[in-house]
Amino acid sequence: MPAASTTGAPVAPSLALLALEPLRGIADYCASLLTASPKAHGDGHPVIVFPGLAGGPLSTRPLRRFLDKSGYVAYDWGQGLNTGPDGDFDDWLDRLDDLLVDVHSAHGRRVSLIGWSLGGIYARELAKRSAPLVRQVITLGTPFGAMADANHAATAWRLLNGDTSQLTPGLQARLRQTPKVPTTAIYSKTDGIVPWRACMEQETYCSESVEASGASHLGLGTHPKVLRIVANRLAQPEGEWRRWDA
């Protein structure tokens, strides 16, 4: 599947999809309560979950609970509410890297990183700078192909931080670069907040894009298909990563 950058400029989701996001997010959560446990069972390795913009421990709790029940050791990102990078971007990543180092040391195993929306940017960048500590990266609706525009999350970022001046052309080009660890980008064509094309990864020997059809942006952490994809990806033996084959 081609990268987002080769399919034309990303277009912001319609206002109708945006307006329906809260209700659809609730519906996705309710659907997850009725979903059977995944067939794939984990090997106990640690997973850090990074929330989306304006999200925090509460928003990722259902996903972390799912991971724990699936046989992993799930960690919150430890920074409270996600209002965007605080100060210099790389200094901010240093703080997140400290948690990655601590979790890796505690388990003596590589750590999988799951990032929802903006949280996926953190996961990808940590994997680029600390690849030996990272087992794989999974992003949920992360618009690394168009962070500064064409998405309603950028508007929210401006409301929280005043502007998107940190997102220079150089940084945006850097964010689009694929981590050199197994990477799965999950996207939904019915995402009401970010353009789905901007959430698609290049197809390489260790990266892929997987569609979670019907999922809302706010429901990406609980939608049954997303959970099935996440469970399948995490259950692959270390060093034997293969692309998704639905």
Give each language-model segment a name:
Residues P179-A246:
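C-terminal catalytic-base region of ester-bond hydrolases, centering on the histidine
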